[in-house]
Curated annotation (Swiss-Prot):
<feature type="binding site">
    <location>
        <position position="130"/>
    </location>
    <ligand>
        <name>Zn(2+)</name>
    </ligand>
</feature>
<keyword id="KW-0482">Metalloprotease</keyword>
<keyword id="KW-0564">Palmitate</keyword>
<feature type="region of interest" description="Disordered">
    <location>
        <begin position="224"/>
        <end position="252"/>
    </location>
</feature>
<dbReference type="InterPro" id="IPR051156">
    <property type="entry name" value="Mito/Outer_Membr_Metalloprot"/>
</dbReference>
<dbReference type="GO" id="GO:0016020">
    <property type="term" value="C:membrane"/>
</dbReference>
<feature type="lipid moiety-binding region" description="N-palmitoyl cysteine">
    <location>
        <position position="19"/>
    </location>
</feature>
<keyword id="KW-0998">Cell outer membrane</keyword>
<keyword id="KW-0472">Membrane</keyword>
<comment type="function">
    <text>Metalloprotease that cleaves substrates preferentially between Phe-Phe residues. Plays a role in response to some stress conditions. Seems to regulate the expression of speB.</text>
</comment>
<keyword id="KW-0449">Lipoprotein</keyword>
<feature type="signal peptide">
    <location>
        <begin position="1"/>
        <end position="18"/>
    </location>
</feature>
<comment type="subunit">
    <text>Interacts with Era and BepA.</text>
</comment>
<feature type="disulfide bond">
    <location>
        <begin position="53"/>
        <end position="108"/>
    </location>
</feature>
<feature type="binding site">
    <location>
        <position position="134"/>
    </location>
    <ligand>
        <name>Zn(2+)</name>
    </ligand>
</feature>
<dbReference type="GO" id="GO:0071476">
    <property type="term" value="P:cellular hypotonic response"/>
</dbReference>
<feature type="lipid moiety-binding region" description="S-diacylglycerol cysteine">
    <location>
        <position position="19"/>
    </location>
</feature>
Length: 252
């Protein structure tokens, strides 16, 4: 749901492993190795997000429109609004047990049924608001640039005359997984938390769900050994931050 750092039992996908099957005649000698990161325009990020989201949708089991999950998400979507910084959004539910949700730069917002089973509507609103924050604040774009800065993708970009339009379906799927599973810095997570809080207030939604979602996740973290989440703020601390903001704003 990541509220990304908070996901349980998440594995980090290998990025664009399909690149290793490309014809290497003359390609590996390209100037791709010189890139430190792949520079992408907003339009390129959107195009790649369109392609990656479409590929992920094709592999997922999507809740039917008449399902309780889809009906709940429609209610939540109506409360949150239909755009991120002017970018139209579309919402779908993936039928999977993962406690997860993500948003991409093209407005692709996906929520896993496992998260909806665990959270109330207000908590799901808060989680989605957090994910929208990662998009609105440019964190997702930076994550894509990092993903495309790997050696394999630099080779693909250089050999194919540009990354957009050159990736196979498997590569796009792996890119999508990399974006969904990306970890953000403590600062980025805190910024997305505050974005969600502010968005909820602006939309007339109680921000309490943001605090209680963290509190639920804090219980899941109890007794956890050292893990990939150690670089991120603890859920209990993030919940307290939201409680402090609510208190300062006179919200019970």
């Amino acid at each position: 749901m990541k509220i990304r750092a908070l996901l349980v039992a998440m594995s980090v996908a290998t990025v664009l492993t399909g690149c290793q099957n490309m014809d290497s005649n003359g390609l590996l000698s390209s100037g791709a190795e010189a890139f430190q990161a792949y520079s992408l325009s907003d339009a390129q990020v959107k195009t790649l997000s369109d392609q990656a989201c479409q590929e992920m949708d094709s592999k997922a089991t999507i809740a039917p429109a008449n399902s309780e999950y889809a009906k709940r998400l429609t209610t939540i979507a109506n409360a949150l609004g239909n755009n991120i910084n002017g970018q139209p959004v579309n919402y779908k539910v993936y039928m999977a047990k993962d406690v997860n949700a993500f948003a991409m730069a093209n407005g692709c917002i996906r929520v896993y049924s496992g998260l909806m089973d665990m959270m109330t509507d207000n908590e799901v609103e808060a989680v989605i608001g957090h994910e929208m924050g990662h998009v609105a604040l440019g964190h997702v774009k930076k994550g894509m640039q990092v993903a495309l800065g790997t050696n394999a993708v630099r080779v693909a970009a250089a050999s194919a005359g540009g990354i957009v339009g050159s990736l196979s379906q498997s590569q796009l799927g792996n890119l999508g997984e990399k974006l969904v599973n990306s970890q953000f810095s403590q600062r980025q997570e805190a910024e997305a938390d505050d974005y969600s809080y502010d968005l909820l207030r602006q939309r007339g939604i109680s921000p309490a769900g943001l605090a209680t979602s963290f509190e639920k996740l804090a219980k899941l973290e109890e007794g956890r050994q050292s893990s990939m989440f150690d670089d991120h703020p603890a859920s209990a601390e993030r919940a307290q931050h939201i409680r402090d903001r609510m208190s300062a704003d006179g919200i019970k």
